[in-house]
From Swiss-Prot:
Residues 355-379, 555-569 have a biased composition (Polar residues). GO terms for molecular function: phosphatidylinositol binding; ubiquitin binding. SUPFAM superfamilies: ENTH/VHS domain, GAT-like domain. One of its GO terms (cellular component) is membrane. Might contribute to the loading of the ESCRT machinery. The lineage of its organism: Eukaryota, Viridiplantae, Streptophyta, Embryophyta, Tracheophyta. This is TOM1-like protein 8. Residues 9-138 form the VHS domain. It comes from Arabidopsis thaliana (Mouse-ear cress).
């Protein structure tokens, strides 16, 4: 008699396996091992049924109890000739589903129970009998193992998975053989040919892709791509892996381009052309802070080529070195020291401004490799002589920058020769006499400290003009208030020397004297006669040095009180050379004084 639970689990009324009933039977066998024989006998009887449906349900129940139950079930199945019954059913060509189910179960069991050397060799014997009959076993299905199953149930799923993986690997290797270096090179050659043909095909012409050669090349590239993927996943050689990855990227790019053209999307081809035709950026960036000034011109560094004016053919972006006024540097201010080469450098100042009378003390550049010269001028004759003072003729007009030194007229008189550095004497008188100064005193707002001696470091003077003015008084040198030209003085040798000072109009500087000329002053003080009567005072010379440095004209005289100076950016005066005549220094002090008029104090301060 069949066990009632087995009867219900294998009823022909069921549409499919009743998994709840099957698991209930497994639990019963695990808790009541005495019912194992009765359950196995009932399954054997249900296999002899003529209904294929019942046979399938009986085989499913048998598979479930062997998988989830213990060793007792395995032994009962092997001893009750259930395996022999199943072999007979497979040989009689039953229903295809029943036969396939029997073959799968016998193959799985013989592998799980370790073949002929296992604990139950009956399973392996059944497997060998079917093989001798020429029956081909199907692919093994995957069975999920149970957590409570012992030995055979644990090894069964693992072995089935390994067998399936081996079968998949074998089929893959047969379908995609491993690539070699030669095949990789062949693949690249095919890619090059296909790329050239695709470049020759118009993006809008889809018919060109339907050519037999193109279709064949695309098919080969796709096959190589699959083989490359298999190579990357299976190889352990690093060099082959790198070559495979590079080939895979190239194949992917080429096939994507083919698909884009086939779908009508020719943007890829247009983008490649646009990349080749994009011109360089013509935007120029000029770094004003890092520009260099060379010879008065600004050099701006740009990264692009020059632009040419099509009409004139001139380069209008590159600065011209000859035109230094085109660009003005915006960096730090240029030093006030004179430049070495006045290449078209023009400095404009307001000649009528009152600020021109402000005293300026030029500073030397400590980093320049020039000699630092400091000139302190004095008469050098002891306390009986007074240091000369120089004042301009008014603050509204520009003053000619001069350097006045004091030296004796001739070494033949026994006076001390001229020296560039003398300490100024403290006495303000000539021989103890009080001399009246006709020049205007300095205004209080332009007072300068006596200690601030103007120093100057000459760099590269362009021209040096020296004018020696011989006088007999301490009267400061000034312009002739009467008009354009001063009076010339005739010495004993009848040599005429003079200076031409035209009236200053429009804020322009009058031209200075000739080079190395000696001019005698035409303004004398009546007090000088006492000097000739009381004591013989040697005539005095004032050396006027004018140094022209291209952009500036600086006063380096010894007047520390209040020299009226123009700015360092005053345009240089034009020099007008005169005919040089020899001077008789022996009788230079004998001058006819009746021909000259002394200037009044009221007119001394006006132009």
């Amino acid at each position: 008699m069949v066990h009632p639970l087995v009867d219900r689990a294998t009823s022909d009324m069921l549409i499919g396996p009743d998994w709840a009933m099957n698991l209930e039977i497994c639990d019963m066998l695990n808790h009541e091992p005495g019912q194992t024989r009765e359950v196995v006998s009932g399954i054997k009887k249900r296999l002899t049924s003529r209904t294929s449906k019942v046979q399938l349900l009986a085989l499913t129940l048998l598979e479930t109890i062997i998988t989830n139950c213990g060793e007792l079930i395995h032994m009962q199945v092997a001893e009750k000739d259930i395996l022999h019954k199943m072999v007979k059913m497979a040989k009689r060509k039953p229903n295809i589903q029943v036969k396939e189910k029997i073959l799968i179960l016998i193959d799985t069991w013989q592998e799980s129970f370790s073949g002929p050397q296992g604990r139950h060799p009956q399973y392996y014997a059944a497997y060998q009998e079917l093989l001798r009959a020429g029956i081909v076993f199907p692919q093994r299905p995957q069975i999920t193992p149970s957590s409570g199953q012992n030995g055979p149930s644990t090894r069964y799923p693992q072995n089935s998975r390994n067998a399936r993986q081996e079968a998949i690997d074998t089929s893959t290797e047969s379908e995609f053989p491993t690539l070699s270096l030669t095949e990789i090179q062949n693949a690249r050659g095919i890619m090059d040919v296909l790329a050239e043909m695709m470049n020759a095909i118009d993006g809008n012409n889809k018919e060109g892709l339907k050519q037999e050669v193109v279709v064949d090349l695309v098919s080969q590239c796709r096959t190589y791509k699959q083989r490359v993927v298999h190579l990357v996943n299976s190889t352990s050689d690093e060099s082959m892996l790198c070559q495979g990855l590079a080939l895979n990227d190239d194949l992917q790019r080429l096939l994507a381009k083919h698909e884009a053209i086939a779908s009508g999307n020719s943007m890829i081809k247009k983008e490649e052309k646009s990349k080749k035709e994009v011109p360089k950026d013509t935007t120029q960036i000029i770094d004003v802070g890092s520009s260099e000034t060379k010879n008065g011109s600004v050099v701006a560094y740009t990264t692009n080529g020059p632009k040419i004016d099509l009409l004139s053919g001139d380069d209008f972006e590159t600065p011209n070195a000859d035109n230094s006024l085109a660009l003005v540097p915006l960096g730090p201010p240029q030093p006030s020291s004179p430049v070495a080469k006045p290449d078209n450098s023009i400095v404009l100042i307001d000649m009528l401004s009152d600020n021109n009378c402000e005293s300026s003390t030029p500073t030397s550049n400590p980093h320049a490799n020039h000699q630092k010269v400091q000139q302190n001028y004095s008469n050098g004759f002891g306390p009986g002589h007074q240091e000369q003072s120089y004042y301009g003729q008014g603050s509204s007009a520009p003053v000619w920058n001069l350097q006045i030194t004091q030296q004796p007229s001739s070494p033949a008189y026994g006076n001390q020769p001229f020296s560039p550095n003398f300490s100024p004497p403290a006495s303000p008188h000539y021989g103890g006499q009080n001399n009246n100064v006709l020049a205007l005193p300095p205004p209080p707002w332009e007072a300068q400290s006596p200690s601030s001696s103007p120093q100057y470091s000459p760099t590269h003077p362009m021209q040096v003009t020296q004018v020696v003015i011989t006088t007999h008084t301490h009267q400061p040198l000034g312009y002739n208030p009467q008009g354009g030209s001063p009076h010339a003085t005739n010495n004993n040798n009848n040599n005429m020397f003079g200076m031409f000072l035209p009236p200053m109009t429009g804020g322009h500087m009058p031209p200075p004297f000739g080079h190395n000329g000696h001019v005698t002053n035409n303004n004398y003080n009546p007090n000088m006669y006492g000097g000739y009567g009381g004591q013989a005072q040697p005539p005095q010379q004032y050396l006027v040095e004018q140094q022209m440095y291209g952009m500036s004209l600086q006063d380096n005289g010894n007047n520390n009180t209040n020299p009226y100076q123009v700015s360092s950016h005053q345009p240089p005066p034009m020099m007008k050379p005169m005919n040089k005549k020899p001077e008789d220094k022996l009788f230079g002090d004998l001058v006819e004084l009746s021909k000259f008029k002394k200037p009044t104090s009221g007119r001394a301060g006006s132009m």
